Amino acid sequence: MKKILFPLIACGLVMPAVAEDKVPRTPSPKGAQVRIILPKNGKTVKGPVRVVFGLKGMGVCPAGLVLPDGKPMEKTGHHHLLVDTEKLPSMSLPMVASETLLHFGAGQTETVVNLPPGKHTLQLVFADFAHIAHNPPVVSKKITITVEAKAKKK
């Protein structure tokens, strides 16, 4: 029972701060940029799709990693890939992983995604150690790709 109760209490203590939008945001340096290197915007590709992330002016660091004094490492973060999303997630709250919001909290700089045939959009958001977008947010341009249907075997 204690194993279940403690996480519930912890969530109860944390959630009010999140709900009130009082989560501090980590500053991003001027000129910081994130981009999708591959695939190129407008291209037709075969699945599964290799996506390579690019970053300028900041460093990649695993989520949750802090300095010995408990403060986050400056000018660092990790990638979040938005797949087929209409709008950006909240920039002031932790981003919640889903089928359309993929986390790369181990510091990954590329991935392979299985997308069905058809048009798809991809966009990156670079976030801090707590999965919260920097201030100002470091967000890539949204790209559109087309995934080819696999040829049927005869």
What are these regions (language model features)?
Residues 54-71:
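Short amphipathic, basic-aromatic surface patches that mediate peripheral association
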Residues 115-131, 139-142:
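Internal, hydrophobic beta-strand segments that form the core of beta-sheet-rich folds
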Residues 88-91, 127-135:
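Short acidic/polar inter-strand loop motif in beta-rich domains
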Residues 47, 77, 116-118:
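A glycine-anchored, Pro-Gly-centered beta-turn/N-cap motif
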Residues 92-111:
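A beta-strand/beta-hairpin structural motif
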Residues 49-53, 109, 118-126:
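Short, well-structured beta-strand segments within conserved domains
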Residues 136-154:
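Short beta-strand elements
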Residues 21-49, 56:
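Short, compositionally biased P/S/T/A/G/V-rich stretches that sit at domain boundaries
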